[in-house]
């Protein structure tokens, strides 16, 4: 419902965590704007600051708490009247978080998203909403994937003007909070895997795909907003379609997304190695408009460690998968994350991981030290390693990864790349132009700086063909070969 105070209320959404959280924030922004709220960029200029928290790892939780506390300080110093925590940490800890974080005026879970406006309005009128009570969200949908589409929650939205529905397709309830040339599109939510270290399925729920028409409608809307690259995200993208009756639904979806007018690049995130199939490899390396980018979640390469993680694979199967990727597209971008110091991990396991990384030639590797996550199976495992051992192993693998990432970047010297321009800043009369090549995902995979010749003009959103001339870690320096395309 719209604000009832007679004057416009303002709200700022502060987002932490992954691209999936970015989508959630923009969907919340769309609902709040529909309800009459004014969206502002900075919390210190808003009546209400909504902090979309991340609960992935310990550092992310600390960052979320610090952000809530910083927003709460604004209540004493500025116009901000209320601070509300939402997102994964709020969903996961609920009332316990509320008790330990009284500075927040409310802790609201995912079920509050559909009527967030009413909750915020009530808070501004002095009411105290009941704090979210966590529950295992895997219990909210049928066990059988095929039965989930009929049971998935659908929030009723305000009617569209006559004539716009249903021919126009599903309504997009989203408001962009940034103006960059790329945007994430959530194609599914939840996860059915049972990795022992991961709490995400418990608070994100069972895996549910979004129907293709919803994904395409949102992609078309983003293209109308000037977006050139869409980043398809979920907790496990390779499972897309399992609840739609088609395990090859992702392969079928990709060409339709890439065909949306105005979209120049389609990127797919978070591929589960055990679920990657030949047809998907073909689609990701040969579909026009889809970049050959593989975000493969290896986590480790020692079969013994992977078994304790309840994951599949090992050094040789993973290397075979990488060979299949490069047989199809030698320049494909490949990134991964690994967990070091998992319970029961031996020095021999770390040696095997390091050997795998040396042979894998990955563009980017994120290295995480294991720490217990509340409520996970790994929390109960024996063989826990001392903190100093975990830290030493993280340091060892991180130093190796830094060398290997630089080596992989150096292999790209002389390579011709397509760079999506994301930033053009004038520095004393000379443009400083930064973007991403096809093998570089947003935010975490490095960037490419363009060394422009005199008179070469580019704008944000342009695709520039360039040749790689230098490297700095995962970052590249490249010189344009042809005029930019708009």
Swiss-Prot record:
This protein's record includes keyword DNA-binding: no
| Subcellular location(s) per record | Cytoplasm
- Bound cofactor: record note: Binds 2 [4Fe-4S] clusters. One cluster is coordinated with 3 cysteines and an exchangeable S-adenosyl-L-methionine.
Q: What class of enzyme is it?
A: transferase
Provide the GO MF annotations for this entry.
4 iron, 4 sulfur cluster binding; aspartic acid methylthiotransferase activity; metal ion binding; protein methylthiotransferase activity
Record GO biological process? tRNA modification
Q: What is this protein called?
A: Ribosomal protein uS12 methylthiotransferase RimO
> What species is given as this protein's source?
Kineococcus radiotolerans (strain ATCC BAA-149 / DSM 14245 / SRS30216)
């Amino acid at each position: 419902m719209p604000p009832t105070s007679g004057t416009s209320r303002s709200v700022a959404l502060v987002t932490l965590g992954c691209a999936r959280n970015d989508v959630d924030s923009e969907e919340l922004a769309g609902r709040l704007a529909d309800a009459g709220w004014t969206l502002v960029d900075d919390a210190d200029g808003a009546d209400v600051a909504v902090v979309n928290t991340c609960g992935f790892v310990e550092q992310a939780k600390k960052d979320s708490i610090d952000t809530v506390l910083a927003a709460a300080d604004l209540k004493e110093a500025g116009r901000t009247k209320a601070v509300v925590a939402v997102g994964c940490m709020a969903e996961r800890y609920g009332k316990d978080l509320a008790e330990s974080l009284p500075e927040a005026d409310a802790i609201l879970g995912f079920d509050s998203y559909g009527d967030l406006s009413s909750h915020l309005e009530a808070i501004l009128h002095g009411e105290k909403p009941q704090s979210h009570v966590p529950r295992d969200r895997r219990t909210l949908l049928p066990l059988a994937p095929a039965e989930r589409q009929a049971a998935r929650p659908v929030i009723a939205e305000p009617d569209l003007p006559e004539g716009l529905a249903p021919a126009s397709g599903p309504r997009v309830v989203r408001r962009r909070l940034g103006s960059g040339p790329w945007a994430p599109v959530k194609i599914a939510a939840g996860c059915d895997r049972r990795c022992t270290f991961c709490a995400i399925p418990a608070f994100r729920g069972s895996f549910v795909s979004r129907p293709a028409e919803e994904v395409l409608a949102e992609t078309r809307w983003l293209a109308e907003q000037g977006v050139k690259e869409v980043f398809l995200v979920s907790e496990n993208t390779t499972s897309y379609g399992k609840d739609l009756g088609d395990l090859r639904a992702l392969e079928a979806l990709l060409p339709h997304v890439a065909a949306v007018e105005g979209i120049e690049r389609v990127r797919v995130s978070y591929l589960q190695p055990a679920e990657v199939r030949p047809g998907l490899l073909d689609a990701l390396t040969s579909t026009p408009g889809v970049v050959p980018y593989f975000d493969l979640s290896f986590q480790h390469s020692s079969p013994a460690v992977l078994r304790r993680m309840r994951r599949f694979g090992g050094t040789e199967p993973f290397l075979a998968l990488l060979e299949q990727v490069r047989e199809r597209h030698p320049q494909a971008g490949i990134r991964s994350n690994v967990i070091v110091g998992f319970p029961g991990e031996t020095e021999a396991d770390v040696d095997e991981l390091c050997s795998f990384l040396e042979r894998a030639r990955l563009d980017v590797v994120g290295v995480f030290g294991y720490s217990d996550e509340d409520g996970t199976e790994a929390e109960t495992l024996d063989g826990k390693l001392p903190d100093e051992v975990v830290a030493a192993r993280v340091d060892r693998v991180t130093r190796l990864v830094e060398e290997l990432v630089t080596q992989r970047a150096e292999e790209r010297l002389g390579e011709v790349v397509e760079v999506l321009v994301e930033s053009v800043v004038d520095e004393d009369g000379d443009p400083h132009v930064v973007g991403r090549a096809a093998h570089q995902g947003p935010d975490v995979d490095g960037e490419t700086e363009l060394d422009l010749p005199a008179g070469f003009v580019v704008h944000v959103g342009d695709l520039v063909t360039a040749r790689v001339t230098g490297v700095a870690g995962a970052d590249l320096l490249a010189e344009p070969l042809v005029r930019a395309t708009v």
